[in-house]
């Protein structure tokens, strides 16, 4: 009997998770204000994800052109358009967008300001604005744009550019920016304190800040099997902004690294 009650409770919880999914492909997900950033995970394949903030506690997920309001044909309306699936996990929400005829629709999220994000897509862009939390974003074929974000950022793109502007940094957590074929363009507040690790294999490094560079130097290795002592060259540049602070790593193979100072 207890087992049946538990299963019934789980079903009720799942049903209550999504308050409403209207004809425009819009899902409202109630969340509680626990005093800690909410965590949202999204994994897409052929779609882009856009995240904006609002003052409420709900998470709103939208896909364009979905639902029974699709265009009519011969007096009939299509009702099998792709939808949004939400799974509540221990550390937050996992949001997915269904495939239809081999295609996946772009996803737009409206979230509370204090939200942590884990966003991944293979063929698509990632665009986030105004979020304060832990932001971890990855795209294979697309660009990453993070505007007026705060907290910590781990961002990577294989075939795209990174453009990031940060209002505040979490001094206790490192930052990482990487791209194989694209520029890395990051704007920090003028009073940022950071220790930098910089590497642009086939590009240039530019900065508005006065960066105190430290020697790259040689890193000692070990004896090989034939008795030769191997020395590994560290090709990274190391430096500090405003005396050093949060650890920030930048790496691009075919692109530039640009570090801007935000205007006051």
Model-predicted segments: where are they?
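Intrinsically disordered, low-complexity terminal regions
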Residues: 1-264
């Amino acid at each position: 009997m207890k087992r049946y009650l538990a299963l019934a409770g789980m079903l009720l919880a799942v049903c209550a998770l999504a308050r409403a999914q209207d004809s425009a492909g819009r899902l409202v997900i109630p969340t509680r204000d626990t005093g800690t950033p909410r965590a949202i995970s999204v994994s897409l394949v052929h779609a882009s994800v856009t995240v904006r903030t609002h003052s409420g506690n709900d998470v709103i997920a939208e896909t364009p052109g979905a639902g029974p309001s699709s265009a009519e044909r011969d007096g009939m309306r299509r009702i099998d358009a792709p939808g949004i699936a939400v799974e509540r996990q221990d550390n937050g929400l996992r949001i997915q967008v269904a495939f239809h005829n081999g295609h996946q629709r772009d996803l737009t999220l409206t979230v509370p300001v204090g939200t942590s994000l884990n966003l991944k897509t293979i063929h698509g862009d990632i665009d986030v604005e105004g979020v304060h939390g832990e932001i971890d974003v990855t795209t294979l074929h697309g660009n990453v744009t993070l505007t007026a974000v705060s907290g910590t950022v781990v961002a990577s793109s294989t075939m795209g550019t990174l453009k990031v502007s940060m209002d505040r940094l979490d001094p206790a957590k490192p930052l990482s920016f990487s791209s194989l074929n694209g520029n890395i363009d990051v704007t920090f507040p003028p009073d940022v304190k950071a220790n930098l690790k910089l590497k642009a294999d086939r590009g240039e490094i530019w900065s508005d800040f006065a960066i105190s560079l430290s020697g790259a130097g040689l890193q000692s290795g070990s004896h090989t099997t034939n008795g030769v002592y191997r020395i590994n060259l560290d090709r990274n540049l190391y430096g500090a902004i405003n005396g050093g602070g949060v650890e920030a790593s930048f790496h691009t193979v075919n692109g530039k690294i640009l570090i801007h100072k935000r205007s006051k």
